[in-house]
Amino acid sequence: MGLHVFTSIQRSAPTNMINNAVAVSAAHKLRFAQDLALFNLDLAEAEEAFDGSAHKEVWQSAPEWQPTREAVERLTAIGDWAKLLFCTNIVFEQLVGSLFRTELIMQVAARNGDYITPTIVGTGEYDYDRDLNYTRALFQMLSRDEQYGAQNRELFGQWLSEWVPRCLDAARGLQPIWSQPADKSVTFATSLEAATEKFRDVLKAIEVDIPEELNQ
Protein backbone atom coordinates (compact mmCIF):
# COMPACT_ATOMS: atom_id res chain seq x y z
CA MET A 1 0.00 0.00 0.00
CA GLY A 2 2.89 2.33 0.62
CA LEU A 3 4.06 1.99 -2.96
CA HIS A 4 0.87 1.37 -4.94
CA VAL A 5 -1.59 3.50 -2.94
CA PHE A 6 0.09 6.45 -1.25
CA THR A 7 3.13 6.89 -3.47
CA SER A 8 0.89 6.79 -6.54
CA ILE A 9 -1.04 9.90 -5.41
CA GLN A 10 1.59 11.86 -3.50
CA ARG A 11 1.75 14.43 -6.33
CA SER A 12 -1.95 14.39 -7.23
CA ALA A 13 -3.57 16.55 -4.53
CA PRO A 14 -4.21 20.27 -5.17
CA THR A 15 -1.79 21.55 -2.50
CA ASN A 16 1.73 20.69 -1.40
CA MET A 17 0.51 20.42 2.18
CA ILE A 18 -1.74 17.47 1.28
CA ASN A 19 0.88 15.95 -1.02
CA ASN A 20 3.49 16.10 1.74
CA ALA A 21 1.14 14.41 4.20
CA VAL A 22 0.39 11.64 1.70
CA ALA A 23 4.12 11.22 1.03
CA VAL A 24 4.66 10.75 4.77
CA SER A 25 1.90 8.11 4.77
CA ALA A 26 3.78 6.32 1.99
CA ALA A 27 6.98 6.44 4.04
CA HIS A 28 5.14 5.10 7.08
CA LYS A 29 3.77 2.11 5.18
CA LEU A 30 7.06 1.35 3.46
CA ARG A 31 8.94 1.50 6.76
CA PHE A 32 6.35 -0.75 8.42
CA ALA A 33 6.64 -3.27 5.57
CA GLN A 34 10.43 -3.15 5.81
CA ASP A 35 10.33 -3.76 9.56
CA LEU A 36 8.12 -6.81 9.06
CA ALA A 37 10.29 -8.10 6.21
CA LEU A 38 13.49 -7.76 8.26
CA PHE A 39 11.90 -9.52 11.24
CA ASN A 40 10.71 -12.28 8.91
CA LEU A 41 14.24 -12.62 7.52
CA ASP A 42 15.76 -12.80 11.00
CA LEU A 43 13.35 -15.56 11.99
CA ALA A 44 14.00 -17.49 8.78
CA GLU A 45 17.75 -17.39 9.43
CA ALA A 46 17.53 -18.17 13.14
CA GLU A 47 14.86 -20.88 13.17
CA GLU A 48 15.12 -23.89 10.86
CA ALA A 49 11.45 -24.67 11.39
CA PHE A 50 10.32 -21.19 10.35
CA ASP A 51 9.22 -20.84 6.72
CA GLY A 52 10.00 -17.27 5.73
CA SER A 53 8.07 -17.54 2.47
CA ALA A 54 4.81 -18.98 3.82
CA HIS A 55 3.16 -15.56 3.91
CA LYS A 56 3.24 -15.34 0.11
CA GLU A 57 1.22 -18.52 -0.32
CA VAL A 58 -1.19 -17.41 2.42
CA TRP A 59 -1.77 -14.02 0.78
CA GLN A 60 -2.26 -15.53 -2.66
CA SER A 61 -4.29 -18.63 -1.79
CA ALA A 62 -5.65 -18.77 1.78
CA PRO A 63 -9.46 -18.32 1.59
CA GLU A 64 -9.64 -16.07 4.64
CA TRP A 65 -7.31 -13.53 3.02
CA GLN A 66 -8.81 -13.35 -0.46
CA PRO A 67 -11.51 -10.71 0.30
CA THR A 68 -8.80 -8.53 1.86
CA ARG A 69 -6.51 -9.08 -1.09
CA GLU A 70 -9.30 -8.13 -3.48
CA ALA A 71 -10.03 -4.96 -1.51
CA VAL A 72 -6.37 -3.93 -1.56
CA GLU A 73 -6.09 -4.58 -5.29
CA ARG A 74 -9.25 -2.55 -5.93
CA LEU A 75 -7.79 0.32 -3.90
CA THR A 76 -4.77 0.42 -6.18
CA ALA A 77 -7.11 0.84 -9.17
CA ILE A 78 -8.72 4.07 -7.86
CA GLY A 79 -7.51 7.07 -9.83
CA ASP A 80 -9.10 9.88 -7.80
CA TRP A 81 -6.63 10.94 -5.09
CA ALA A 82 -9.34 12.06 -2.65
CA LYS A 83 -11.38 8.88 -3.05
CA LEU A 84 -8.28 6.73 -2.68
CA LEU A 85 -7.19 8.56 0.47
CA PHE A 86 -10.71 8.40 1.95
CA CYS A 87 -11.31 4.74 1.13
CA THR A 88 -7.88 3.73 2.41
CA ASN A 89 -7.33 5.75 5.59
CA ILE A 90 -10.96 6.21 6.63
CA VAL A 91 -12.62 2.94 5.57
CA PHE A 92 -10.16 0.12 4.86
CA GLU A 93 -7.70 0.92 7.63
CA GLN A 94 -10.47 1.22 10.21
CA LEU A 95 -12.47 -1.88 9.28
CA VAL A 96 -9.66 -4.20 8.16
CA GLY A 97 -6.20 -2.85 8.98
CA SER A 98 -6.80 -1.75 12.56
CA LEU A 99 -9.11 -4.70 13.16
CA PHE A 100 -6.26 -7.09 12.45
CA ARG A 101 -3.42 -5.08 13.97
CA THR A 102 -4.99 -3.49 17.04
CA GLU A 103 -7.86 -5.81 17.87
CA LEU A 104 -6.02 -9.10 17.21
CA ILE A 105 -2.22 -8.91 17.02
CA MET A 106 -1.79 -6.37 19.81
CA GLN A 107 -4.22 -8.30 22.02
CA VAL A 108 -3.02 -11.90 21.61
CA ALA A 109 0.65 -11.87 20.57
CA ALA A 110 2.22 -11.36 24.00
CA ARG A 111 -0.26 -13.75 25.62
CA ASN A 112 1.02 -16.40 23.21
CA GLY A 113 4.71 -15.76 23.87
CA ASP A 114 5.47 -13.28 21.08
CA TYR A 115 6.80 -10.04 22.53
CA ILE A 116 8.52 -8.73 19.40
CA THR A 117 5.67 -8.54 16.90
CA PRO A 118 3.61 -6.18 19.11
CA THR A 119 6.56 -3.77 19.20
CA ILE A 120 6.74 -3.68 15.40
CA VAL A 121 2.98 -3.52 14.94
CA GLY A 122 2.68 -0.88 17.65
CA THR A 123 5.01 1.37 15.69
CA GLY A 124 2.85 0.87 12.62
CA GLU A 125 -0.25 1.71 14.61
CA TYR A 126 1.33 4.90 15.93
CA ASP A 127 2.16 5.92 12.36
CA TYR A 128 -1.39 5.19 11.23
CA ASP A 129 -2.82 7.28 14.08
CA ARG A 130 -0.89 10.26 12.75
CA ASP A 131 -2.05 9.52 9.20
CA LEU A 132 -5.63 9.27 10.40
CA ASN A 133 -5.37 12.62 12.17
CA TYR A 134 -4.56 14.57 9.01
CA THR A 135 -7.02 12.55 6.92
CA ARG A 136 -9.84 13.19 9.38
CA ALA A 137 -9.02 16.90 9.53
CA LEU A 138 -8.94 17.14 5.74
CA PHE A 139 -12.30 15.51 5.15
CA GLN A 140 -13.85 17.30 8.10
CA MET A 141 -12.84 20.59 6.46
CA LEU A 142 -14.36 19.45 3.17
CA SER A 143 -17.58 18.40 4.91
CA ARG A 144 -17.88 21.81 6.57
CA ASP A 145 -17.13 23.85 3.46
CA GLU A 146 -19.69 26.65 3.26
CA GLN A 147 -20.20 26.35 -0.48
CA TYR A 148 -19.59 22.70 -1.29
CA GLY A 149 -20.01 20.94 2.05
CA ALA A 150 -23.36 19.32 1.20
CA GLN A 151 -22.09 17.99 -2.12
CA ASN A 152 -18.92 16.74 -0.49
CA ARG A 153 -20.85 14.84 2.18
CA GLU A 154 -23.05 13.32 -0.50
CA LEU A 155 -19.95 12.19 -2.39
CA PHE A 156 -18.42 10.73 0.77
CA GLY A 157 -21.65 8.82 1.30
CA GLN A 158 -21.36 7.33 -2.17
CA TRP A 159 -17.83 6.19 -1.44
CA LEU A 160 -18.98 4.68 1.85
CA SER A 161 -21.84 2.80 0.18
CA GLU A 162 -19.30 1.17 -2.12
CA TRP A 163 -16.47 0.50 0.29
CA VAL A 164 -18.06 -0.25 3.66
CA PRO A 165 -19.72 -3.49 2.43
CA ARG A 166 -16.50 -4.53 0.67
CA CYS A 167 -14.36 -3.90 3.75
CA LEU A 168 -16.84 -5.59 6.08
CA ASP A 169 -16.74 -8.65 3.83
CA ALA A 170 -12.95 -8.56 4.02
CA ALA A 171 -13.07 -8.19 7.81
CA ARG A 172 -15.49 -11.09 8.24
CA GLY A 173 -13.37 -13.21 5.93
CA LEU A 174 -10.54 -12.95 8.48
CA GLN A 175 -12.67 -14.45 11.26
CA PRO A 176 -11.02 -17.94 11.18
CA ILE A 177 -7.69 -16.38 12.20
CA TRP A 178 -9.15 -15.49 15.62
CA SER A 179 -9.45 -19.22 16.43
CA GLN A 180 -5.79 -20.02 15.70
CA PRO A 181 -3.94 -18.66 18.79
CA ALA A 182 -3.52 -21.08 21.68
CA ASP A 183 -4.59 -18.36 24.11
CA LYS A 184 -7.82 -16.99 22.65
CA SER A 185 -8.08 -13.87 24.78
CA VAL A 186 -10.41 -12.04 22.39
CA THR A 187 -13.25 -13.11 20.13
CA PHE A 188 -13.82 -11.96 16.58
CA ALA A 189 -17.19 -10.49 17.52
CA THR A 190 -15.61 -8.37 20.26
CA SER A 191 -12.81 -7.22 17.97
CA LEU A 192 -15.16 -6.32 15.12
CA GLU A 193 -17.44 -4.41 17.48
CA ALA A 194 -14.48 -2.40 18.79
CA ALA A 195 -13.27 -1.63 15.26
CA THR A 196 -16.69 -0.57 13.99
CA GLU A 197 -17.25 1.64 17.03
CA LYS A 198 -14.00 3.49 16.34
CA PHE A 199 -15.02 3.76 12.70
CA ARG A 200 -18.33 5.34 13.72
CA ASP A 201 -16.42 7.91 15.77
CA VAL A 202 -14.32 8.83 12.73
CA LEU A 203 -17.41 9.21 10.55
CA LYS A 204 -19.09 11.39 13.17
CA ALA A 205 -15.99 13.59 13.25
CA ILE A 206 -16.20 14.21 9.50
CA GLU A 207 -19.96 14.65 9.81
CA VAL A 208 -21.22 11.98 7.42
CA ASP A 209 -24.12 9.60 7.95
CA ILE A 210 -23.37 6.23 9.52
CA PRO A 211 -23.83 3.46 6.92
CA GLU A 212 -26.65 1.01 7.62
CA GLU A 213 -24.26 -1.91 7.18
CA LEU A 214 -22.60 -1.05 10.49
CA ASN A 215 -25.85 -1.74 12.34
CA GLN A 216 -26.37 -5.21 10.91
Segment roles from a protein language model:
Residues 16, 20-23, 80-91, 115-122, ...:
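Short, solvent-exposed segments of well-ordered alpha helices
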Residues 94, 161-216:
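C-terminal accessory extensions/subdomains outside the catalytic/core fold
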Residues 21, 25, 29, 119-124, ...:
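Extended, well-ordered alpha-helical scaffold segments
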Residues 50-90, 110, 149-153:
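Acidic/His metal-coordination segments adjacent to aromatic residues that form catalytic metal sites
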Residues 1-62:
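Long, hydrophobic, well-ordered secondary-structure blocks that form the structural core
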